[in-house]
Amino acid sequence: MASRKEALARRANRVRRHLKSVANGRPRLSVHRSSKNIYAQVIDDVAGKTLASASTLEKDLRGSLKTGADTAAATVVGKLLAERASKAGVTEVVFDRGAFIYHGRIKALAEAAREGGLTF
């Protein structure tokens, strides 16, 4: 029987394998969630470069947020990431949720990024 860590890695690989087949050259919006913070970045896999990133660890966000571990914080990060991605010239992405289910903070970040102008 696989350990929890192995199962999460297997699920993340399965999601990313599917994304590669549907990406068609679009950058990937990768999301990572920890118990205290949330991180997101837009990655160009062809060039191997990060085009835009945002997280609850940034100094300007840390002062304004009550905590980095709620849906309100994820919403702020999603809007900030969409703003930075549009400045970098990115409007279309594929959403890489990794091993996380599309619910709660992950869903809040995705919806805020859509409101900010990203399409996926």
From Swiss-Prot:
A GO molecular function for this record? structural constituent of ribosome
Sorted alphabetically, which InterPro entries does this protein's record hold?
A: Ribosomal_uL18_bac-type, Ribosomal_uL18_bac/euk
Q: Name one Pfam family in it.
A: Ribosomal_L18p
Give the record's keywords alphabetically: Ribonucleoprotein, Ribosomal protein, RNA-binding, rRNA-binding
User: Which Gene Ontology terms of cellular component type are present?
Assistant: cytosolic large ribosomal subunit
Has the keyword Plastid been applied to this entry? no
Please indicate if the UniProt record lists Repeat as a keyword. Answer: no
Single biological process term from Gene Ontology: translation
CDD domains to which the protein is assigned, alphabetical: Ribosomal_L18_L5e (cd00432)
UniProt lists the family membership as follows: Belongs to the universal ribosomal protein uL18 family.
Q: How does it assemble?
A: Part of the 50S ribosomal subunit; part of the 5S rRNA/L5/L18/L25 subcomplex. Contacts the 5S and 23S rRNAs.
What does the UniProt function comment say about this protein?
This is one of the proteins that bind and probably mediate the attachment of the 5S RNA into the large ribosomal subunit, where it forms part of the central protuberance.
Q: Per its UniProt record, what NCBIfam families does this chain match?
A: L18_bact (TIGR00060)
Put simply, this protein is called: Large ribosomal subunit protein uL18
